[in-house]
Design a protein with these regions (language model features):
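Membrane-associated feature with strongest affinity for ZDHHC
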Residues: 71-162
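A glycine-centered loop/beta-turn motif at secondary-structure junctions
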Residues: 167-168, 182, 186-193, 217, ...
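Helical hinge/lid and interdomain linker segments adjacent to catalytic or ligand-binding clefts
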Residues: 169-171, 176-266, 441, 449
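C-terminal domain-boundary segment and adjacent tail
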Residues: 200-202, 384-406, 442-444, 561-562, ...
Length: 764
């Protein structure tokens, strides 16, 4: 069964349109090398891979890549054609290396490139943008002690001596609080997502009072808008200018042009701002400023605001720099193909800077793709803030890493059990769920299984849940009883529905409460542990779903795709700015689906769904690997949704194809240094505990880092700190065992609730 809620959108392009980015070529076998081997060779050329493991009932899953038909896409460029390449390097609209993808340049070998710059800014990887080959190289960042020329001035490790506190002050105008505070909570949730230490003063705090003594207490001050004179008066401007001159960074958001806004514009280094609703895209480029250093792919630099400004207008403030203020443009707004002005500027002040952003990145960004693609638009603001903090802290920041460990990111393997062959054994062998669990277990991975408990049709089998649990894949989640869609007209019910009395044979006889409550109850009973995770059939969300899930004790949901939120990190739905008509500030964690084993399109014949199968497996694998690695470069996660079933219109052999592709993806993830052994419920528990843990640190050029970690209301295990510098030592007597690698330190034990510990760390 397909689980895309919106496969028929005309604006959803092919998911196989992504480029690679940032692979560590120093590793013995890079992930791109492994993908090359998979794409360029037939399966018969690959070694047989036994993914079988004995199960409690004696069944054995034995899937061998060599037994499958070759994973080779149709190729229109024959051998001997001068356009044929072993690895694609051209941006010519042709699949030159026959991997099923057009103009996908892998970040290895011939795609290394250079630009006219020094230090780390001089080299990067080529990619295709607007039909042309471009070199995507990082911009400068503050110098730190790591053996590299980070600020690209031609000198290695010439870090500025400093005594500072890498922390953010969010100073929200009072009117944002009086509006309800949704924008403020959304900004705070982004800081929480990226583990950035911050303070958010109360609504009655006066600007001038909060800004006194700013120096030494913060490295970045964010003033969200709209901004007028009542937010930034003369005294506030002088404090902020003094802060920036001494090395701090200020980020202003959406200043207005009005009779009272002269001080705001003067601080920003702008002449005026103009409100527009015809902007369709934002393009980062021009001057390489430190705050956009991490935005180094085409998808991160070219953000779609709306596909139709006449039907869906979005407010953007175009900024006009003051030429006398040395203000530079870091991003521009476009109406169609016409540039209409600046949308991100930087005014240099002394040792620091004032940035101004004219667009609301945390709530308005139209998606270019729905699933099976690299969609980082919702992560751009977090990356920008993290780099702005890095600039204000002269590179010496401390943040909470997004992973419970030293790895760069997570691959979350999730599986919807919504077909007979995935739910129970038969002529095809063990249930598809059991076979998938065996593959995962064989690679040391942990999957999350969402069970449809269809006892009405007679294929619900609790023994399958028990076999999955025996392989370490529990707790499991709910996926409904009958796998119906959930239109708004579906009755909610009163949540008194019980098994076996709840017997819906049609959608009209079903209730939202019954589908959720009974599915969660049966799945939990079969697993022997409460089911606290949920995914809606077809990713179709009922308007009252989150009220019902919250009342049933669900803590984590995965019913949206990356195209819905444009983020690749868990979301706190209580603080999410938009769609509170659905969420009602319910405290669930949302994990958007990044990858799916099918994708949709619409043509004159209607809505179609293309399933993963032998003929397109190499294309899926290339696209999935590309997305996974590019997310990992941002420390963002990738959530895979794969159905361990035959698929639409295919027989038992297609299940074996899916198992083999997942096995190969797990190998690629391991080669790239990703964790694959974290379930959605484990990630939710870590994410909540991480959010409650407080980290505070200072940096001194003679003593290094000194700081504290305070656990929140729940115990936090696996908390990992990421520093701006590579470390030679980390000392925390009360932390328990720790492990240090490069810039990261993981606390191997668990800090009890409310426990406060002190640490010191010395750069190399």
């Amino acid at each position: 069964m397909g689980c895309e809620r919106d496969p028929g959108r005309a604006d959803v392009p092919s998911p196989l349109d992504a480029s690679w980015d940032r692979v560590d070529a120093s590793t013995k076998d890079t992930a791109s090398d492994l993908v090359d081997a998979t794409v360029d060779a037939t399966v018969a050329d690959l070694p047989s891979t036994d993914m079988g493991h004995p199960l409690p009932d004696g069944a054995l899953v034995d899937v061998r890549l060599g037994d499958l038909s070759p994973f080779v896409a149709d190729c229109s460029v024959p051998l001997g054609d001068p356009r044929r390449e072993p690895q694609e390097t051209l941006c010519d609209g042709i699949d030159n290396d026959c991997d099923g993808q057009v103009d996908l340049l892998l970040p290895s070998g011939p795609n290394a490139c250079s630009v006219e710059a020094r230090g780390v800014c001089s080299t990067g990887w080529a990619g295709c943008a607007e039909g042309a080959r471009r070199c995507f190289a990082p911009g400068p960042s503050p110098e730190v002690s790591d053996g590299l020329d980070n600020d690209c001035d031609g000198v290695v490790d010439n870090a500025r001596a400093a005594a500072l506190r890498p922390r953010v002050l969010v100073l929200a105008p009072r009117y944002l609080w009086t509006k309800g505070g949704d924008e403020i909570r959304a900004l705070a949730s982004i800081l929480d997502q990226w583990g950035i230490p911050y303070d958010l003063p109360t609504p009655d705090t006066e600007f001038s009072a909060a800004l006194r003594g700013l120096l030494g207490r913060y490295s970045l001050a964010i003033v969200p808008g709209y901004l007028e004179g009542d937010a930034v008066d003369t005294i506030a401007r002088l404090y902020l200018e003094e802060f920036a001159t001494a090395g701090g960074v200020v980020l202003l958001h959406k200043p207005l042009t009005s009779p009272s806004s002269a001080e705001v514009l003067r601080l920003a280094g702008l002449r005026r701002t103009t409100r527009r609703t015809d902007v369709t895209s934002l393009r980062i480029g021009g001057v390489a400023v430190p705050a956009v250093r991490s935005l180094d792919t085409a998808e991160e630099r070219d953000l779609l605001v709306t596909d139709d400004p006449s039907a869906r207008p979005v407010e953007t403030f175009v900024l006009e720099p003051d030429p006398e203020a040395s203000t530079v443009i870091a991003a521009r707004a476009f109406a169609g193909s016409t540039e209409v002005g600046a949308v991100l500027t930087r005014r240099g002040l002394g040792h620091g800077a004032v940035y101004t952003l004219g667009h609301d990145l945390h709530s308005w960004s139209h998606y270019r793709c729905y699933v099976n693609c690299f969609e980082p638009a919702g992560d751009v603001l977090g990356l920008l803030i993290r780099d702005a903090l890095r600039e204000g802290a002269a590179g010496h920041l401390v943040v909470k890493h997004t992973v419970p460990g030293l790895e760069d990111a997570l691959l979350l393997s999730t599986h919807d059990i919504d077909a007979t062959e995935s739910a129970r054994s038969g002529p095809w062998g063990a249930a598809g769920a059991t076979q998938m669990a065996s593959v995962l277990h064989g690679r040391g991975a942990i999957g999350s299984f969402f069970f449809t408990t269809d006892y009405v049709s007679g294929w619900w089998d609790p023994a399958t849940v028990r076999s999955v649990c025996a392989l370490g894949m529990c707790p499991v989640g709910g996926h409904s009883v009958r796998h119906f869609t959930s239109p708004a007209s579906q009755p909610v019910g009163d949540c008194s529905e019980r098994f076996p009395g709840y017997v819906p044979t049609t959608l009209a006889e079903s209730t939202l409460c019954g589908e959720a409550r009974v599915s969660l109850m049966l799945a939990g009973e079969a697993a022997g542990s409460a089911a606290v995770a949920w995914r809606s059939p077809f990713l179709d969300v009922h308007p009252r779903l989150f009220d019902v899930l919250s009342e049933q004790g669900v803590r984590v949901d995965s019913s949206f795709a990356v195209g819905d939120f444009k983020t690749n990190l868990p979301l706190d739905l209580a603080a999410t700015f938009h769609r509170q008509d659905l969420f009602h500030h319910r405290g669930l964690t949302e994990l958007p689906v990044t990858l799916d084993d099918g994708f949709g399109a619409r043509d004159e014949h209607g809505t179609l769904r293309t399933e993963l199968q032998a003929s397109n497996a190499s294309s899926f694998l290339s696209a999935w690997s590309s997305v996974m690695l590019r997310n990992a470069a941002n420390n963002a996660h990738t959530t895979l949704l794969l159905h361990p079933s035959f698929g639409v219109g295919h027989g038992p052999e297609n299940l074996q194809v899916k198992l083999a592709v997942v096995d190969r993806l797990l190998q690629l993830a391991a080669a790239a240094g990703l964790r694959t052994d974290v379930s959605v419920t484990a990630l939710d528990a870590f994410w909540r505990a991480r959010r409650g843990a407080l980290v505070d640190a200072t940096y001194d050029s003679t003593r290094g880092y000194q700081g504290t970690i305070t656990a929140g209301p729940t115990s936090v295990a696996g908390l990992t700190l990421e520093f701006g510098d590579a470390l030679r030592s980390f000392d925390c007597p009360d932390c328990g065992p720790t492990r240090l690698a490069g810039r990261r330190v993981v606390l191997l034990g668990a800090l009890p609730p409310g426990r406060r510990v002190e640490f010191t760390a010395l750069p190399r």
